[in-house]
């Protein structure tokens, strides 16, 4: 029994010198990046600075993973989410970046335990990171690393949030909401459907497997729940803004002095309109590139939800 286990481990793409080198190099890179920024741009003993430092590794990882996912996202969109036409780039991109992500998860727990232990939540920190380390290594072992890298585009909202946390002037709830809904809801739903097809179940190159589909669909309810909370939060924020504007209008009418800059109000309206157009264009692109059978199935599912 142990001989078979050892033989399987030796044959696994996880147990190679290249993977070990990538992991060590990535760990060293995160160490240098964190300490370089923590001791310069984000130095200081204030609580606000500590909160900013806790987002250094997450923001850096999210940016790198998003950029690395683009070749796979492009191929999926171009070929209607057909995995048979997606070049995996396993050795040159998918496997190294998967290990890079594992190194981030380990680094965040390691350096977080040293520098910002009280900011590491048990569920979203220890449980989440540990579970993803195991999942990524298993997907790498099964030859599914390129599918994981395609899903890494869902790190865009994490990067947007990280930038906003480290630089409050750049914080944008609109940008976060747009990227979250377009990647973790729309793109994720299309990814789930694609992994249920024969080509999707054969992404490992050997036997067909439902495991990638099951893994992706298990995470989806969490994204839907987060999206629900996000929409509710935006609705409350929008209601508050309307109340503030109504109060400002009353004060303006009473005093006869304009309290808001008309040019600024117009710029805000144009910004909201641009965000709506970007989101609508992304949804239309995903919908138009999906096969007809998928669109029909998704439409039927939406109708069934409406009638519940």
Question: Where do the model's predicted regions map?
Answer:
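Aromatic- and histidine-enriched alpha-helix N-cap/loop-to-helix transition segments
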Residues: 58, 151, 219-222
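N-terminal signal-anchor/initial transmembrane insertion module
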Residues: 1-116, 228-237, 241
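C-terminal transmembrane module of eukaryotic multi-pass membrane proteins
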Residues: 166-301
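Conserved small/polar residues in nucleotide/adenosyl-binding loops
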Residues: 306-308
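Multipass alpha-helical transmembrane domains of eukaryotic endomembrane proteins
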Residues: 94-211, 230-237
């Amino acid at each position: 029994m142990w001989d078979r286990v050892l033989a399987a481990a030796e044959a696994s793409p996880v147990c190679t010198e290249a993977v070990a080198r990538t992991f060590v190099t990535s760990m060293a890179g995160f160490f240098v990046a964190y300490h370089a920024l923590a001791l310069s741009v984000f130095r200081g003993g204030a609580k606000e600075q500590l909160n900013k430092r806790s987002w250094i590794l997450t923001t850096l990882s999210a940016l790198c993973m998003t950029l690395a996912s683009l070749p796979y996202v492009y191929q999926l969109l171009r070929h209607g989410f057909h995995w048979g036409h997606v070049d995996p780039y396993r050795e040159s991109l998918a496997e190294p970046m998967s290990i890079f992500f594992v190194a981030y998860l380990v680094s965040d727990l390691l350096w977080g335990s040293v520098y910002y232990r009280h900011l590491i939540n048990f569920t979203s920190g220890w449980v989440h990171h540990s579970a993803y380390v195991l999942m990524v290594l298993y997907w790498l072992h099964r030859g599914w690393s390129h599918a994981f890298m395609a899903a890494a585009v869902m790190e865009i909202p994490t990067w947007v949030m990280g930038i906003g946390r480290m630089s409050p002037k750049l914080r944008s709830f609109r940008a976060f909401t747009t990227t979250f809904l377009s990647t973790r809801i729309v793109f994720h739903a299309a990814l789930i459907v694609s992994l249920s097809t024969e080509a999707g179940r054969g992404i490992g190159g050997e036997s067909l497997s439902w495991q990638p589909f099951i893994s992706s669909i298990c995470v989806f309810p969490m994204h839907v729940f987060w999206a629900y909370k996000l929409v509710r939060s935006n609705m409350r924020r929008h209601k508050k803004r309307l109340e503030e504007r109504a109060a400002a209008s009353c004060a303006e009418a009473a005093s006869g002095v304009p309290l808001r800059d008309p040019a600024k109000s117009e710029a805000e309206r144009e910004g909201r309109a641009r965000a709506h157009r970007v989101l609508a264009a992304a949804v239309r692109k995903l919908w138009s590139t999906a096969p007809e059978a998928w669109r029909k199935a998704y439409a039927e599912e939406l109708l069934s939800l409406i009638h519940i």
